Amino acid sequence: MHILTAGVDEAGRGPLVGSVFAAAVILPETFDLPGLTDSKKLSEKKRDALAEMIKEQAAAWYVAAATPEEIASLNILHATMLAMKRAVDGLAVRPEKIFIDGNRIPEHLDIPAEAVVKGDSKIIEISAASVLAKTARDAEMYALAQRHPQYGFDKHKGYGTKQHLEALKQYGVLPEHRRDFAPVRNLLAQQTLF
C-alpha cells in the first residue's frame, strides 16, 4: 500500500531582502520526472519548466512564505519553520508522512515527520518542493526588480553580492530588506551615526 508522503523544502534563507519561501508537495505514486533534483543544481530555465510540470502532476502542492517582518521578529530559522508549517497546512490533501529537507522539523505538526539532510537530492517529493520554493522566491525577486531596478534583484536574487551591497549604500534600505541581517543592520547603524 502506498503511503501518502509530502516533501518540504525552503528557499531564500540567506538573502538580505525578501521573504523566505517553503513548499510542500505530494506526488502521485506513478510520478516520474526525469531531471528532477535539488533546485540549486538546475538552471533557471529547467527549474521553471519543472515547476510547471510539478504543479500539473502533483496530487497536492502549496507554497507559503514568511515575510521580512516575521524574519526580523522570529529570526530566520523560526521564520523558515513557520513558512514550512504554513506550506504543510495549506495542502489540499493530508499526507500520512512528511519528509523535510535539513536537520530540523517545524513545531506543532500533527503529522509524522522526518528531517532528511540533503533530502532535496535524495527524496523526489523534497526535490519537487525545492523547485517550487525556489521558483516562488525568484518570482518575488523579479517583481522587486521591476519596482526597484537599480538594486539588480533580478541578477543576484537578493544575496549579499558586491553589486547588492553597493546599491544598498547608494540607494538605501528598502522596506523589503531584512533589517536584522548584518550587512543591512550595519548600514542602518552607520546611517544613524551621521
Swiss-Prot record:
Residues annotated to bind a divalent metal cation: 9-10, 101
One Gene Ontology term, aspect cellular component: cytoplasm
GO molecular function: manganese ion binding; RNA binding; RNA-DNA hybrid ribonuclease activity
Domain RNase H type-2: 3-193
Claim: Metal-binding is one of the keywords in the record: yes
Cofactor: Mn(2+); Mg(2+)
Annotated localization: Cytoplasm
Principal localisation: cytoplasm
Cofactor: binding details: Manganese or magnesium. Binds 1 divalent metal ion per monomer in the absence of substrate. May bind a second metal ion after substrate binding.
Pfam families per UniProt: RNase_HII
GO BP field: DNA replication, removal of RNA primer; mismatch repair
Catalytic activity: Endonucleolytic cleavage to 5'-phosphomonoester
Keyword Cytoplasm included in the entry's annotation: yes
Keyword entries, A-Z: Cytoplasm, Endonuclease, Hydrolase, Manganese, Metal-binding, Nuclease
First-level EC class: hydrolase
The protein's Enzyme Commission number: 3.1.26.4
Classification via HAMAP family: RNase_HII_B (MF_00052_B)
Family in the record: Belongs to the RNase HII family.
Function description: Endonuclease that specifically degrades the RNA of RNA-DNA hybrids.
Family matches, as PANTHER family: RIBONUCLEASE H2 SUBUNIT A, RIBONUCLEASE HII
Name of this chain's protein: Ribonuclease HII
Originating organism: Neisseria meningitidis serogroup C (strain 053442)
Gene, per the UniProt record: rnhB
